[in-house]
Amino acid sequence: MALLFLFLTATSFARKPNVIMIFTDDQGSIDAGCYGADDLDTPGLDKLAQRGVRFTQFYAASAVCSPSRAGLLTGRYPIRAGLIGNAGSQKGGKGGLDPDQITMAETFKAAGYATAHIGKWHLGYNTNMMPRAQGFDHSFGHMGGCIDNFSHFFYWSGPNIHDLWRNETEIFEDGKYFPDLMVEEATAFMTLNKEKPFFIYFAMNAPHYPYQGDVKWRERYKDLPYPRNLYNAFVSALDQRIGKLIREVDRLGLRNQTIIAFQSDHGHSVESRAHHGGGNNGPYRGHKFTLWEGGIRVPAIISWPGHLPRNEVRDQMLHGCDWLPTFAELASIPLIENDIDGKSMTQVIEDPDAPSPHEYLRWDMSGQWAIRKGDWKLLGNPKASIDGPALEAADKKLFLVNLAEDIAESTNLAGTKTNIVAELKALRN
């Protein structure tokens, strides 16, 4: 802890570090080379892990897009942030993050940071819920849940709508690849603000459907089974842009002054628009829209060369709400809102033997819920997954598993471990 204390003490007197939060969309539990995907090229993420700390028991705040983002930006469980389902994807639609919630951007802005949202928003498509009303000085990207990466239209059930904005102005970049536009926008923002600390929320619309990897990546994976070939091409395309973004930080001479963190918002999709799959959840059961491990256990990394450990792995139980208090502690800035559920990860980052900062974690999502305490996990009203055994009537109500003994969540112990069930259920109150 002495090393971390020196870093934090120095930070309080020196210029505050820049922070870039990279948030990918529908990236599966092990969909990176550094997480064991041997059929996938991700040199950008692999290098980030080599220059930082990689987490193996990191949980998204939800198994669906908007609530996961709400948890990230507020440090609160989505149910306490007031958003447990997706926000609308058409202008003026219902749902979104309440403007009264204090966001990560507002916290950084109050500490003198320049703040930018670049990429996907999906936290409200009304003026009072869009990024510039939530603490971001600058915003570039789409407000809805996804777009075509070349036309920048939201294609769903109609009407199809164009969705690309710079601040409150609709812009048109027809035919230009959205991940490239994101890197260009981030580079311009960093260049403009390189003399002061900045915070960038870099929220990628990948590998969320539509699967639109570059030609070179489609060629690279053409012999893989469908739809893994399409999915991998898009993951490698996003990784290529992450690598480019980090090289731009290096080029500007800012790497040792910049904390870069990465997380997927939840597990991979098996929706029809996603070709019914393509992602890899490894040994875990489940996927997006489920609270099995494959829906919420996600890849996550933090890197700050010269300040945090390099090429190390942490196995403690952590959560997407933890980024806000962690960044605040590392940057020595005060939290505006202290009534949050996230806990600082700094002790875990520094010490592989430090305990998890959480006694337990909880999830609430459209009727489903889950509690994890230690190795025990209780799911309430679990949704069937395409990769697990069929759920019996009792399983559909309560499903208890010991993750240390059954990482695939295949055997329900709720009927025999009633004392554990009662203990975990009580934590929801």
Residue ranges and their predicted role:
Residues 1-9:
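Bacterial N-terminal signal peptides
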Residues 11-399, 405-427:
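Formylglycine-dependent sulfatase
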